[in-house]
Amino acid sequence: MPELPEVEVTRLSFAFEIAGARVISVRIGKPLRWPLGCSPTQLAGRSVQAVRRRGKYLLIDLDQGLLLVHLGMSGSLSFARQLPPAGAHDHFEMTTTLGTLRLTDPRRFGAVVYAKGEDAPEAHKLLGKLGMEPLSDDFDVDRFHDELKRRRAAIKQVLLAGDTVVGVGNIYASEALFMAGIRPTLSAARLSRPRSARLHAAIRDVLARAVATGGSTLRDFSSAKGENGHFQLEAMVYARQGQPCRVCATPIKSLRQGQRSTFYCPHCQKA
């Protein structure tokens, strides 16, 4: 699943080019996770003001309302002046005066949802319960620690839930916990203030480096320009079960948490 870095990389790869474009037409393919919420013809004539991100959602601001885009498990966006003919997995296509934006999603867990502009976007039901943005000033270390002290679940599970800090998916949760020296199964409530601060810094660092390297391409992720990410090449623990830790040479181990694979170093993450 594309996580925060992949969504941010996607945003950066087309936000500037599409700003100011006028929508000519919208084509809908097979049903996605949620319906569009309006007739495609209603979007014709709207102009694109900006493209923002909230967690793993892209927010395409229009002069009237906005489009919420979620890439689901396997989705990706493409944007170009001219794209090849739509294929079997291309389920949303918005043609504009500056190019065509297309959502390709083989598993169809992604979605494009229109939201009217009467209310603040943050109030939308898909966004209202999201946690702090880890790459913004909103991600306050004291608030982060206070939130963790109220959670008895394993720290890895708390990070994945998205209601404390948003967008830290499976890859980057494992990496951040390694950097902070915290065992993934430790109860979040047991983290001291200094350890919460180390995790806070590790989350910001890992996500920033992932964005800078284009995200992680494990299977089919690419930016809206078709470029693959490279963060997976420098991962410290993720998908490295049995390989030596890059710090201490102890073999990396894995375990299952909530039906997701977690990777960690038993020496560097003793507690």
From Swiss-Prot:
Renumbered zinc finger spans (FPG-type): 236-270
Single GO biological process annotation from the record: base-excision repair
Co-factor binding details: Binds 1 zinc ion per subunit.
Required cofactor(s): Zn(2+)
GO terms for MF: 8-oxo-7,8-dihydroguanine DNA N-glycosylase activity; class I DNA-(apurinic or apyrimidinic site) endonuclease activity; damaged DNA binding; zinc ion binding
Active site (UniProt): 2-3, 56, 260
Record InterPro entries: DNA_glyclase/AP_lyase_DNA-bd (IPR015886), DNA_glyclase_Znf_dom_DNA_BS (IPR015887), Formamido-pyr_DNA_Glyclase (IPR020629), FPG_cat (IPR012319), MutM-like_N-ter (IPR035937), Ribosomal_uS13-like_H2TH (IPR010979), Znf_DNA_glyclase/AP_lyase (IPR000214), Znf_FPG/IleRS (IPR010663)
Binding site for DNA: 89, 107, 151
EC assignment: 3.2.2.23, 4.2.99.18
Secretion signal span: none
Keywords assigned by UniProt, alphabetized: DNA damage, DNA repair, DNA-binding, Glycosidase, Hydrolase, Lyase, Metal-binding, Multifunctional enzyme, Zinc, Zinc-finger
Catalytic reaction annotation: Hydrolysis of DNA containing ring-opened 7-methylguanine residues, releasing 2,6-diamino-4-hydroxy-5-(N-methyl)formamidopyrimidine; 2'-deoxyribonucleotide-(2'-deoxyribose 5'-phosphate)-2'-deoxyribonucleotide-DNA = a 3'-end 2'-deoxyribonucleotide-(2,3-dehydro-2,3-deoxyribose 5'-phosphate)-DNA + a 5'-end 5'-phospho-2'-deoxyribonucleoside-DNA + H(+)
Pfam families reported for this sequence: Fapy_DNA_glyco, H2TH, zf-FPG_IleRS
UniProt family annotation: Belongs to the FPG family.
Function noted in UniProt: Involved in base excision repair of DNA damaged by oxidation or by mutagenic agents. Acts as a DNA glycosylase that recognizes and removes damaged bases. Has a preference for oxidized purines, such as 7,8-dihydro-8-oxoguanine (8-oxoG). Has AP (apurinic/apyrimidinic) lyase activity and introduces nicks in the DNA strand. Cleaves the DNA backbone by beta-delta elimination to generate a single-strand break at the site of the removed base with both 3'- and 5'-phosphates.
Subunit and partners: Monomer.
Record's protein name: Formamidopyrimidine-DNA glycosylase
Organism: Albidiferax ferrireducens (strain ATCC BAA-621 / DSM 15236 / T118)
